């Protein structure tokens, strides 16, 4: 069976010789027929530490290199700029904040708010 080759965006370069790459795809909902964004996160072996956060990279499936790493970096397709990285981090923070706000929306009122009323 041939090895899969896919493209994705580097989301983390904090580990030596390892990158976290996010592969985005669209999936059609079976009932509502709406396209939904899904993502897969892969840990990728980057022998020369060539890639950085925000870079678009091409990766290939490989034999297991560690507990999580099953992919190798083929090449960097597009280097990111500092502006791209800042925008990526800001978008991630906004998504986390919205997720927390939605989680807290269903919680009952606190004691201090109940006694003030």
Curated annotation (Swiss-Prot):
It comes from the Bacteria. Coiled coil: none annotated. PANTHER family: 40S RIBOSOMAL PROTEIN S11 FAMILY MEMBER, SMALL RIBOSOMAL SUBUNIT PROTEIN US17M. Pfam families: Ribosomal_S17 (PF00366). GO terms for molecular function: rRNA binding; structural constituent of ribosome. Part of the 30S ribosomal subunit. This is Small ribosomal subunit protein uS17. Residues 97-117 are annotated as: Disordered. The keyword Endoplasmic reticulum does not apply. Transmembrane segments: none annotated. One of its GO terms (cellular component) is cytosolic small ribosomal subunit. Keywords: Ribonucleoprotein, Ribosomal protein, RNA-binding, rRNA-binding. One of the primary rRNA binding proteins, it binds specifically to the 5'-end of 16S ribosomal RNA. InterPro entries: NA-bd_OB-fold (IPR012340), Ribosomal_uS17 (IPR000266), Ribosomal_uS17_bact/chlr (IPR019984). Belongs to the universal ribosomal protein uS17 family. GO terms for biological process: translation.
